[in-house]
Swiss-Prot record:
GO-annotated biological processes: chromosome segregation; DNA recombination; DNA repair; DNA topological change
Region Disordered, residue ranges: 821-854
Reactions mediated catalytically: ATP-independent breakage of single-stranded DNA, followed by passage and rejoining
CDD domains listed in its UniProt record: TOP1Ac, TOPRIM_TopoIA_TopoIII
Function: Releases the supercoiling and torsional tension of DNA introduced during the DNA replication and transcription by transiently cleaving and rejoining one strand of the DNA duplex. Introduces a single-strand break via transesterification at a target site in duplex DNA. The scissile phosphodiester is attacked by the catalytic tyrosine of the enzyme, resulting in the formation of a DNA-(5'-phosphotyrosyl)-enzyme intermediate and the expulsion of a 3'-OH DNA strand. The free DNA strand than undergoes passage around the unbroken strand thus removing DNA supercoils.
Organ and tissue specificity: Isoform 1 is found in testis, heart and skeletal muscle. A 4 kb transcript which probably represents isoform 2 is found in thymus, kidney and pancreas.
GO molecular function, one term: RNA binding
Organism: Homo sapiens
SMART domains: TOP1Ac, TOP1Bc, TOPRIM
Single GO cellular component term: condensed chromosome
Name the UniProt record assigns to this protein: DNA topoisomerase 3-beta-1
Annotated family: Belongs to the type IA topoisomerase family.
Length: 862
């Protein structure tokens, strides 16, 4: 029996599709990577009985990156990244072992059916899967077709079965367009980012950003936000005057009239008009009109409109809204959420989709009435040729989904029902009055038929007071006429919804990437999200955009990226050559990069005004080992130490607190040690600023603290404080934290394992002796007499933290947010876990602290 391998984009999709195609009769097991399951069943394929194996990937299998040495910022000129630096495809997540997993499942298979998402990224992943699987599949005989592509827009029985019955081929051109975009973004983004990050972080201490990134899409996105900020800053309010009149229609009722001139900017002229109208006692009716108008039902829903509404009405950021929509899609509640189309296909089953909502407690009455009276033909929208508009695929309740998932699903469903409803019809009445020489108007609206606003009440015509019945020549007494002084207002900061509209209009990003670009400028500290989800640029974001404008406006204007997007679309359509587009675009940006580097002084002048130089930033913390003067600690990201006398900057560990460590000095370079801590319940370790940046020994790497230093005799080093192999990771050593008392901690110097132990002990010391069972260093603990856990009022005990039954009761392991016993040999802590070499796979050395200090010294000095 032949075997058909089928691959979806996510594990949940694979399970849903397999259940539909197998009609529920399938067997499942976990794959070797633990993240993806394999679902097996028998059936027929190409007219013959076969065994189906349905599995998945977890998004992209591969990612594009530079070869090893080109990833070292200090050793490569960023200009080389445009052409000279070779790239390679690496596994997107090496921990998943996705390539090996696909090869294991694909070995010996005869056919492959690709169920990846039906967009350009999905096509690209198709070929990543094929690159892994085709070499291990059985060879085709006589030109037999073995590779198939399923195209679908929703996870419903009908759509999946139709896709299986109409298999096609993956689109190589669409995959190439994604390859081109990835390479362009990698080369251009890395070159500009590396240059400006190194240039400015070496000069200014309060940039508050660990990475000053540039992106071909990200930067124009930021440009829109800064452009609005500039308009606000340059806005000068103007005073204007308005006449407001009130007429009495009966004893208890009056009408407020709007001036036909709207406003004037000269007070004297406004005063003249006021004087002319103030004398009049009656307002004459000049004209009346009553017109029936309609408010159009919405177009079918596409991604951009969904993101706009999610931000403006639901308070959900674009990235979060997209993730929520993807979850609803994989669970089968909505159709594919990435689409540019706003027009339902001719064969779209509108009645069938509507019928699914007929019993919903919130909109059942509206749906039943539509089905009984006949649905209205949806408006003709734009057909982008990708996926149908976003629609609900099955009924769901608030209790079933909950939270943001329900709110987004509710909006999508209400929007769908509205597209097949009738327009909202209302009567607009207008009365024009003359008071002296001036004309005033009032208008009112009366709803005739709510139409689609019944299901989208927030779109309904606002209720207004009905106007009195009157005709030309009628007179009404004037209640009052007054002059109001007002001022013009500046525009507000862009909302996310407005930014999405601008990005779509100018062709910046795609429906899938727009949320990513907006999220990036927030994470890079270029903008902050204010109330009402408005995007306010930070000082750094403003200076960067102004700097780009000063040097080369095309770096921030949307025009050049829009042109690139058009070229990428031509690749996807097979109308442009991949290599030519790539080469031409890189050549353009390479020239721009060289000009940018030569003109960086222009941006630097703007930076000088907004940010402080390193020497003037920070507070004195620890002494430099070279000049013995105080170095300044710069807390803004990335935190670092700067010696203004030596003009040297030393990087520090991030995402924690830094403080002086007892004024102790490193025995190698005389720098004062500092202590890094992630909090009272997390890790902490001392480090020498110089050794952290310039490793003193061959087996040390940049960025290692004292807990990884192999100095044979320093009291802070791994040699003196190391205990034994980590209980979780393969390369780490558990090291005593000597600063943690009286709540003592032992932490791994590689992973985030922290063991809390010996609370309230006076002193904990790592002994030179080792355990006879596991070879870990013994700990000598001096307990508080009043709280000693030892029998017979003893206060001192030496033992192995892993094997000694006394110590086993006093140790608790913390790993990330979870808390569990450190010794897991059985249900209780007493049983131990059996350390030593048995746990480590063959060929892996067992890390432990060095024991023979003289041998270690000899190794370094020889």
């Amino acid at each position: 029996m032949k075997t058909v391998l089928m691959v979806a984009e996510k594990p949940s999709l694979a399970q849903s599709i397999a259940k539909i195609l197998s009609r529920g009769s399938l067997s499942s097991h976990k794959g070797l990577n633990g993240a993806c399951s394999v679902h097996e069943y028998t059936g027929t394929f190409a007219g013959q009985p076969v065994r189906f194996k349905m599995t998945s990937v977890c998004g992209h299998v591969m990612t594009l990156d530079f070869l090893g040495k080109y990833n070292k910022w200090d050793k490569v000129d960023p200009a080389e990244l445009f052409s000279q630096a070779p790239t390679e495809k690496k596994e997107a997540n090496p921990k998943l072992n996705m390539v090996k997993f696909l090869q294991v499942e694909g070995r010996g298979c005869d056919y492959i059916v690709l169920w990846l998402d039906c967009d350009k990224e999905g096509e690209n992943i198709c070929f990543e899967v094929l690159d892994a699987v085709l070499p291990v599949m059985n060879k085709a005989h006589g030109g037999e077709k073995t590779v198939f592509r399923a195209r679908f827009s929703s996870i419903t029985d009908t759509d999946i079965c139709n896709a299986m019955a109409c298999l096609g081929e993956p689109d190589h051109n669409e995959a190439l367009s994604v390859d081109a975009r990835q390479e362009l973004d990698l080369r251009i983004g890395c070159a500009f980012t590396r240059f400006q990050t190194k240039y400015f972080q070496g000069k200014y201490g309060d940039l508050d950003s660990s990475l000053i990134s540039f992106g071909p899409c990200q930067t124009p996105t930021l440009g829109f936000c800064v452009e609005r900020h500039d308009k606000i800053q340059s806005f000068k309010p103007e005073t204007y005057w308005v006449l407001q009149a009130k007429v009495n229609t009966d004893k208890d009722r009056s009408l407020l009239l709007d001036w036909d001139r709207v406003r004037v900017f000269d007070r004297e002229i406004a005063q003249m008009f006021l004087n002319m109208t103030k004398l009049e006692k009656e307002a004459q009716v000049e004209a009346t009109s009553r017109k029936e108008k309609a408010k159009q039902r919405p177009l079918a829903l596409n991604t951009v409109e969904m993101l706009r509404v999610a931000s403006s009405s639901l308070g959900m950021g674009p990235q979060h809204a997209m993730q929520t929509a993807e979850r609803l899609y994989t669970q089968g509640y909505i159709s594919y959420p990435r689409t540019e189309t706003t027009h339902y296909p001719e064969n779209f089953d509108l009645k069938g989709s509507l019928r699914q909502q007929a019993n919903h407690p919130y909109w059942a009455d509206t749906v039943k009435r539509l089905l009984a009276e006949g649905i209205n033909r949806p408006r003709k929208g734009h057909d982008a040729g990708d996926h149908p508009p976003i629609t609900p695929m099955k009924s769901a309740t608030e209790a079933e989904l909950g939270g943001d998932a329900w709110r987004l699903y509710e909006y999508i469903t209400r929007h769908f029902i509205a597209t097949v409803s009738h327009d909202c019809k209302y009567l607009q009445s207008t009365i024009s009055f003359r008071i002296g020489p001036e004309l005033f108007t009032c208008s009112g609206k009366t709803v005739l038929s709510p139409g689609f606003t019944e299901v989208m009440p927030w779109q309904s015509v606002p209720l207004e007071e009905s106007l009195p019945t009157c005709q030309r020549g009628d007179a009404f007494p004037v209640g009052e006429v007054k002059m109001l002084e007002k001022q013009t207002n500046p525009p507000d900061y862009l909302t996310e919804a407005e930014l999405i509209t601008l990005m779509e209009k100018h062709g910046i990003g795609t429906d899938a990437s727009i949320p990513v670009h907006i999220n990036n400028i927030c994470q890079r500290n270029y903008v902050t999200v204010e109330s009402g989800r408005r995007l306010k640029p930070t000082n750094l974001g403003i200076v960067l955009v102004h700097g780009y404008y000063k040097i080369d406006a095309e770096l921030v204007l949307p025009t050049i990226r829009s042109a690139v997007e058009k070229q990428l679309n031509l690749i996807a359509q097979g109308k442009a050559d991949y290599r030519q587009v790539l080469g031409h675009t890189l050549d353009v940006f390479k020239r721009k990069f060289h000009y940018f580097v030569d003109s960086i002084a222009g941006m630097d002048e703007l930076m000088e005004v907004s940010f402080s130089p390193l020497a003037a930033t920070g507070k004195p913390l620890s002494r430099c080992g070279k000049c013995h003067r105080f170095m300044k600690y710069i807390q803004a990201k990335p935190s670092r130490l700067h010696c203004s006398h030596c003009d040297e900057t030393y990087t520090l560990p991030q995402n924690g607190t830094i403080k002086l460590y007892k004024e102790l000095r490193c025995p190698l370079d005389d720098f004062e040690l500092v202590l890094w801590s992630s909090g009272s319940r997390g890790k902490s370790y001392p480090l020498c600023p110089y050794c952290y940046n310039h490793p003193p020994f061959r087996d040390m790497k940049k960025g290692m603290g004292c807990n990884e230093c192999t100095h044979p005799s320093c009291q802070h080093s791994l040699s003196m404080l190391g205990i034994g192999q980590c209980v979780e990771c393969e390369s780490g050593v558990l090291v005593l934290d000597p600063t943690s008392g009286p709540k003592w901690k032992v932490a791994c110097n590689k992973c985030n394992v922290v063991a809390h132990c010996f609370e309230n002990a006076h002193r904990v010391r790592v002994s030179a002796d080792t355990c006879s069972v596991c070879e870990a260093a013994l700990l000598d603990v001096d307990f508080n007499k009043a709280k000693s856990p030892l029998p017979g009022d003893e206060t001192q005990h030496m033992g192995c933290v892993f094997c000694d039954p006394v110590f086993q009761e006093l140790v608790e392991l913390k790993h990330a947010a979870s808390c569990h016993p450190m010794h897991r040999g059985g249900p209780g802590r007493r049983q131990g876990r059996g350390r030593g070499r048995a746990r480590r796979p063959p060929g892996k050395p067992n890390p432990r602290r060095p024991k023979d200090k003289m041998s270690a010294l000899a190794a370094y000095f020889v």
